[in-house]
A protein has these predicted regions:
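Conserved beta-propeller blade signature
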Residues: 68-72, 114-117, 165-169, 234-238, ...
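Beta-rich catalytic cores
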Residues: 54-57, 78, 96, 103-104, ...
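Surface loop/turn motifs at the tips and blade-to-blade linkers of beta-strand repeat domains
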Residues: 51-55, 98-103, 143-150, 214-219, ...
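Beta-strand-rich domains and repeat architectures in extracellular enzymes and scaffolds
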Residues: 49-74, 319-325, 341, 345
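Blade-level signature of beta-propeller repeat domains, shared across WD40, Kelch, NHL, RCC1
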Residues: 397-423
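Residue-level detector of Asp-centered blade-edge/turn motifs that repeat once per structural unit
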Residues: 63-66, 110-112, 160-163, 227-232, ...
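Asp-box/WD-like beta-propeller blade repeats and closely related beta-sheet repeat scaffolds
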Residues: 96-97, 105, 121-161, 217
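Beta-propeller domain segments
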Residues: 26-42, 155, 172-211, 220-222, ...
Length: 423
């Protein structure tokens, strides 16, 4: 029998607030079965599958306890910025997409019976039922408004702790806090008052602004990937590093060094911490905190005696956009409580990028070097590219079965990585 697939788009009334797209099939019990992502390279025993495509610019993602997937889009698709994805026939592929929320953004998180989301200037939450389904998609509570967004690095990543606090990244909109038209850094950097840090707000209070929150940590240029580590009960973040060393300071940095520096860095962050931007950066080659050239540095002078040290460092310009501490049991024991990182860019030094990396942890600290876990999302050899980049990993989530989901914000593909135990 020929498969007949009907695509029905229903704009549901204000009673629900959903835009609903369903795939209906006749005569085929597996009309949209997940297809293997044969180009994605994963370790032995693992497999990658494509469970959804053409989602739009899919940023962060969260999976409910029943397996529903909520994904945040950085641009609206059919007028909606959040989509609930559902596999109704359990064939491994998404066949129902339900859109809601009329704002784009990056952040999304489930905690304490609520779905938390963000736009580039605000934070919202939606009440969930016992199945972690959104009850009133057209009536979110507004938790925070008025966050800085000035056209560069505007995404507001979010995470919620166990004490009803929500943490929000507010990135810098300036690469190094230079005075306009000069190579000199502003001292003190005025951006630090309202950006380049993590702000803490109440997760259960509406209509908050900067004045209601706490600048939890400062000196972080841009954090897109962040997660709450359940083993340490602390916040971990991934910082995007700065650039343009050779452009502004050719007397101190060669083009090669400019491609190698600074490191992308992982920090364990506590209240009052300062990671040092814009005054210093971390050099993973020298393994030192180096004084920024805008503030008197020459590529060798150290600085930041009172700033925190990174717990892990990675090659420059790889763009860490997702961070997830793995707590599942599907993957082998060595992955338990370790950190997965989605890298959204590439390293000129390694000619590698657009990958998911893994850092093993023991007793709440990295216990070994980082490694490539899932690779070749780019779809081309970055050392000798033969075509455009195909996919850019961005968000990470753990499914109720322990599988790992990876979003792609370039072409809107959703991947699921699973492990099959040897028989």
């Amino acid at each position: 029998m020929h498969k007949i697939v009907f695509r029905v788009t229903l704009l549901v009334t204000a009673l629900t607030g959903f835009t609903h797209t369903a795939a209906l099939a006749s005569g085929d019990t597996t009309p949209n079965a997940a297809k293997p992502a044969v180009d994605i390279k994963v370790p032995a025993g693992f497999s990658a599958a494509i469970v959804a495509e053409d989602l739009g610019p899919a940023r962060h993602i969260v999976v409910s306890k029943t397996g529903d997937i909520y994904v945040k889009l950085s641009k609206l698709k059919d007028g909606k910025g959040i989509y609930r994805l559902r596999d109704t026939n359990k064939d491994g592929s998404i066949d129902e997409k339900t859109g809601f929320g009329d704002y784009p953004g990056t952040g999304i998180y489930i905690k304490n019976g609520y779905l938390y989301t963000s736009s580039n200037t605000s934070v919202f939450r939606y009440k969930l039922n016992d199945k972690e389904e959104v009850l009133q998609p057209d009536q979110p509570e507004t938790l925070v408004t008025g966050l800085v967004a000035k056209g560069r690095d505007e995404s507001k990543s979010i995470v919620v702790d166990n004490q009803q606090h929500i943490y929000v990244n507010v990135a810098s909109y300036n690469d190094a806090c230079r005075e306009p038209g000069t190579g000199k850094g502003m001292m003190p950097c005025p951006l630090l008052d309202s950006a380049a840090g993590i702000w803490q707000f109440r997760a259960d209070r509406q209509n908050q602004t900067y004045g209601d929150g706490i600048k939890y940590a400062t000196g972080l240029k841009n954090v897109v990937g962040l997660d709450w580590n359940p083993k340490t009960n602390t916040l971990f973040v991934m910082q995007h590093g700065r650039g343009q060393f050779h452009d502004f300071y050719p007397q101190y940095y060669t083009p090669q060094q400019s491609g190698q520096l600074p490191a992308e860095t992982m920090y364990e962050v506590r209240k009052g911490d300062d990671a040092g931007w814009p005054y210093i950066y971390y050099d993973h080659i020298q393994k030192k905190k180096i004084l920024a050239p805008e503030y008197g540095g020459d590529g060798k002078k150290t600085g930041g005696a009172k700033t925190i040290d990174p717990v892990a460092a990675f090659p420059a310009h790889m763009g860490p956009n997702g961070l997830l501490f793995y707590t599942g049991t599907m993957f082998p024991e060595r992955y338990r409580n370790g950190a997965f990182i989605a890298f959204h860019g590439q390293s000129p030094e390694l000619k590698k990028g657009y990958m998911v990396a893994f850092v093993p942890f023991k007793n709440g600290k990295p216990s070994g070097p980082w490694e490539i876990f899932a690779d070749n999302f780019a779809g081309t050899d970055l050392a000798k590219p033969t075509g455009p980049i195909q996919h850019r990993p961005c968000g990470l989530a753990q499914g109720p079965d322990g599988s790992l989901y990876v979003t792609d914000d370039l072409n809107g593909t959703l991947y699921q990585i699973s492990y099959a135990r040897p028989q």
